[in-house]
Amino acid sequence: MRRKVALAFIGLFTLILISRSVSAEVDGDRLVREAVEYYRGLASISVVEMVIHRPTWERKMVIKAWTRGVSDSLFVIVAPRKDFGNGTLKKGREMWTYNPKINRVIKIPPSMMAQSWMGSDFSNNDLAKSDSILTDYVHRVVATEEHEGKKVYVVESIPKPEAPVVWGKQILKIREDAILLVEEFYDEDMKVVKRLSGYDIQMMGGKLFPKRWKMEKIGREGEYTLLEYKRLEFLDDLPEWIFTLQFLRNPKRL
């Protein structure tokens, strides 16, 4: 009996040492930055189908998106026709939305960046996969896993003091080739609220990329949003005039 207890203690102690070793050897900040930069590339143009699913209804839309660096993004709905032209521009730490029916641009304050985008389970920050996760959080590797024969780093992301975020923490699972597999969002009581999962990894835009993404609400069965990339092109750069209010308002941009 004593021998079993001793072996169990040794095993637990070994796991603790391994965990500390992983945390010491791998820079969590670097991992997260590489994952965000891999996801967005230097610049990109994409067409994405979004499906908002609820227990009693489902809504579909098609979005065209432009991104540049880790902070500039433009998203415009191209279908269905009734929503055509609704857009969101994020440039640096500022964000605007445009409604063509009333021809009005509204500036979104940082405190509202976590609000739902077009009624989906994605927030404005989620959809843009913006630099908030880089600038507002401190990251550390807490464990490792395996996915399709590749090492996966489990990263705990804690908000910096006074950061304008609503989450108590985030947990990210990043594959060794910089592909983000999972992002979990925790409230201030450290209970997981929603989970983003990337899957169906295949060649897109010249590199391996999850073609499909699912954002689901924990504990609310049947409530989730799916994203499927229909087209994805990574570029070296995009012109400045794309990320302007004039382009956001201009229906000829598509």
Stretch-by-stretch model annotation:
Residues 128, 150-244:
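Gly/Pro-enriched, hydrophobic low-complexity segments
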Residues 1-4:
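Positively charged n-region of N-terminal signal peptides that target proteins for export
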Residues 24-43, 49, 58-59, 87, ...:
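Flexible, processing/modification-adjacent segments and terminal tails
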Residues 35, 63-67, 197-203:
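Extended lipid/amphipathic-ligand handling interfaces
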Residues 45-82:
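N-terminal, post-signal-peptide region of Sec/Tat-exported proteins
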Residues 8-17:
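Bacterial N-terminal signal peptides
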